[in-house]
Amino acid sequence: MGNGMNKILTGLFLGNFKDARDVEQLHKNNITHILSIHDSARPMLEGMKYLCIPASDSPSQNLIQHFKDSIAFIHECRLKGEGCLVHCLAGVSRSVTLVVAYVMTVTDFGWEDSLSAVRGARTCANPNMGFQKQLEDFGKCEVHHFRTWLKDTYGESTFHDKDEAKQLLDKHKQQEAAESQNATSSGRQWNSHLTSLSSRSYSNYTTET
């Protein structure tokens, strides 16, 4: 959460409150637009274009109502060849939800694959359960209309979003496989250690006859 902003797609970055004030990082990544979503979201830096959404990290907080404005803000920035940073406080829940909704709209990914793709770039990404349910509902009811609206409004995309998202999704799957393998290996080592201790304990309490 504190290792700097992460690139999700060309021109789209995800980070935390600290990243949104890090002028060096912002300049390095050509950030000109900042989408800020947290309880006291407000513009902080001169020369930046802001979309500020006051919202709490509560499962009952309605974020779907902000998806269209957020998607348009991000997309218009990217079409200019500039960078957009989406952030909340920790860059874990609220901002991730908006970014996942955007990824769903510019690809044909469902919400789970879109979230996994985001996690491929930012491992701490973890929207609360209420936000995950909203993403699921968005995928069932609204995303198809949003894809049509985006195409009708901005034309055919020249980005390679699906390919970039697929690379992140594959990266996440590799990370999960490595973690699973490490956990299995650790479990075997622990079981071996317990067996060794048990054998020693038994030998200490037995005598030859």
Curated annotation (Swiss-Prot):
One BP term from GO: signal transduction
Skewed-composition ranges (Polar residues): 177-190
Region Disordered: start-end pairs: 169-192
EC number: 3.1.3.16, 3.1.3.48
GO cellular component terms, semicolon-separated: cytosol; nucleus
InterPro entries: Dual-sp_phosphatase_cat-dom (IPR000340), Prot-tyrosine_phosphatase-like (IPR029021), Tyr_Pase_dom (IPR000387), TYR_PHOSPHATASE_DUAL_dom (IPR020422)
Transmembrane stretches, start-end: none
Catalytic activity as recorded in UniProt: O-phospho-L-tyrosyl-[protein] + H2O = L-tyrosyl-[protein] + phosphate; O-phospho-L-seryl-[protein] + H2O = L-seryl-[protein] + phosphate; O-phospho-L-threonyl-[protein] + H2O = L-threonyl-[protein] + phosphate
Pfam families: DSPc
Segments forming domain Tyrosine-protein phosphatase: 4-144
Subcellular location: Cytoplasm; Nucleus
Gene Ontology molecular function terms on file: protein serine/threonine phosphatase activity; protein tyrosine phosphatase activity
Keywords from the named record: Cytoplasm, Hydrolase, Nucleus, Protein phosphatase
Residues at the catalytic site: 88
Top EC category: hydrolase
Function, as annotated: Activates the Jnk signaling pathway. Dephosphorylates and deactivates p38 and stress-activated protein kinase/c-Jun N-terminal kinase (SAPK/JNK).
Similarity annotation: Belongs to the protein-tyrosine phosphatase family. Non-receptor class dual specificity subfamily.
Protein name listed in UniProt: Dual specificity protein phosphatase 22
Organism: Xenopus laevis
